[in-house]
Each structure stands twice: as C-alpha cells, then as structure tokens.
Amino acid sequence: MIQIENTPNPNSLKFISENKISSVGVQEYQKTNVEQIDNYFIKTLLNLDGVELILVSENFLSVKKKEDSKWDNLKPSIISYLNDY
C-alpha cells in the first residue's frame, strides 16, 4: 500500500511505502545526473517523462516533477514501480 502526501511545493509529492525503500539514509537524485546513478529503480523513476528529482528515505520517496507535467500522468507509474520494488 502506497500513501501519497502533499508537500509545501505543489510540484512535489511524498510517496510513503509500508516496505523499506532504502537502508542508507536520505539520498537525493537529479535527472541531470541520471547516467551516473547505479540504482536501476531510481534510474527508472528519473527516466519517467516529467520527473526532475527524487529524494529517497527509508520508507518514502519525494518526487519533484517539472512544472508543466501533470500528477495524473505520473502518479500511476510511480505507484506501480513502488509496488513492484
């Protein structure tokens, strides 16, 4: 089960998982550095059209989208990837 919370930034959402996502603390990943990322899961999310940045913690992801992208287009893919992870 994935819960979604709004953040103060309308271009960012917090996706909370019941499962552990990361065991290395908080990490930030930007689309501009996607080629340098070894984590396939993070790389896949960053390659979604409209995703700019991902902040990963133990049980949640905070995803920042481009201003002109729509959450209705991104949320289903993000949730699907999290459920499969």
Regions inferred by a protein language model and the residue ranges of each:
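Short acidic amphipathic segments
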Residues: L45-F60
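Flexible metal-binding regulatory segments at protein termini and peripheral loops
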Residues: Q3, P8, S80-Y85
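Short glycine-/aliphatic-rich beta-strand segments at the starts of folded cytosolic domains
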Residues: T7-T32
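A generic structural motif
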Residues: L13, N59-K65
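Short, surface-exposed beta-strand-loop junctions and turns on beta-sheet-rich folds
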Residues: I21-S22, L61, S69-W71
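Short amphipathic alpha-helix segments
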Residues: N33-L48
